[in-house]
Amino acid sequence: MSFMRRMKVELSAFFAGSSCVYPKHAPQPIKEDALLSGSLESTNRPYAVAKIAAIEMCSAYNRQYGTRFLAGMPTNLYGPNDNYDRNYSHVVPALIRKMHEAKTNGADQVVIWGTGQPRREFLYSDDAADACIFLMNLDDAGHRVWRDGVPCRCR
């Protein structure tokens, strides 16, 4: 950021945050103003704190130097080259893998873990890229924190 400011880069810069920056027990669906409103998930805390520091740095640079650094919080992304590992994938790739394996093995049902109560938001990776470009081209985007995604439950 410092280099971009010194070089007087006029285009926006986009910092991709993470949904882990929001409190563990934030009301669902999470709103932008939930940032810094409660305790973070302990297992993600160091990562979340680093992301929050970068978000704050974007805001500080914008106020002090008039830069156009944006912070976006992409929701749970899915798309090409996703991680389908049986033990480490996220919700959408895990569901795709389970459905594919069930069809391949001729299973008549698929077991989905959890209660179905937590709400998650999902966004296709190409749509996330389009949203980033759109936001960077806004003249009045300022230093707001931006989120995107569609809330849904997995049952």
Specify the residue positions occupied by each region the protein language model found.
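Heptad-repeat alpha-helical coiled-coil signaling segments
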Residues: D82-N83, P118-R120
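Active-site loop of short-chain dehydrogenase/reductase
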Residues: M7-F14, H25-A26, G66-R68, A107-Q109, ...
